[in-house]
């Protein structure tokens, strides 16, 4: 009988103000897997984009500067996405919410880096797309069609990486505003 009273007293205690409620955690945790999925997509798309473009750049012996720019931006975007993916996975595994364990400085830095990566990716993709269209490499005589199709595939994946970066930028902007409003 005493044992049942002890068990019921454990469950009758009011919730602690220091421990987030289950409802709050359920509202936050759906966003963490979303950001992890976006980071995975960023990494995969930017990896494919820069590896295909590096192959194209090797074929033209590095003579076209916008292809070099696209490869460089792809490498930077891929490295940034991998670093953010690692940190996001660490936060999800650790069980941190968007406000616990993440400093406001990190929120600012993530938002700024996401924005910069987004703009750099669309800049690199548009520079390469313009080059493919204007340079005459993809002429009507059929020469360079393999080069053109690979370049087009790389631009497509760079654009998909841009979409993933912009979606994660929206989420990190949400986290930043939420962090600012709590302060």
UniProtKB/Swiss-Prot annotation:
The chain crosses the membrane at residues 34-54, 73-93, 119-139, 157-177. Keywords: Cell membrane, Glycoprotein, Membrane, Transmembrane, Transmembrane helix. One of its GO terms (cellular component) is plasma membrane. It is a multi-pass membrane protein. The keyword Transferase does not apply. Residues 55-72, 140-156 are extracellular. It is found in: Cell membrane. Glycans are attached at residue 141. Residues 1-33, 94-118, 178-183 are cytoplasmic. InterPro entries: CASP_dom. It comes from the Eukaryota. The keyword 4Fe-4S does not apply. Belongs to the Casparian strip membrane proteins (CASP) family. Homodimer and heterodimers. This is CASP-like protein UU2. It comes from Selaginella moellendorffii (Spikemoss).
């Amino acid at each position: 009988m005493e044992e049942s009273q002890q068990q019921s007293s454990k469950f009758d205690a009011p919730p602690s103000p220091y421990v987030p409620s289950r409802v709050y955690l359920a509202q936050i945790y759906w966003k963490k897997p979303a950001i992890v999925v976006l980071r995975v997509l960023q990494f995969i798309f930017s990896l494919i984009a820069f590896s295909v473009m590096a192959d194209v750049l090797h074929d033209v012996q590095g003579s076209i500067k916008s292809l070099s720019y696209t490869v460089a931006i792809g490498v930077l975007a891929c490295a940034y996405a991998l670093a953010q993916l690692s940190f996001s996975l660490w936060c999800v595994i650790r069980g941190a919410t968007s406000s616990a364990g993440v400093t406001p400085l990190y929120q600012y830095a993530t938002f700024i880096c996401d924005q910069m990566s987004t703009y750099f990716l669309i800049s690199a993709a548009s520079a390469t797309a313009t080059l493919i269209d204007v340079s005459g490499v993809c002429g009507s005589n059929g020469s360079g069609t393999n080069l053109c199709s690979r370049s087009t595939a790389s631009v497509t994946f760079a654009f998909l990486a841009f979409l993933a970066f912009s979606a994660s930028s929206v989420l990190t902007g949400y986290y930043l505003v939420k962090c600012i409003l709590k302060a």
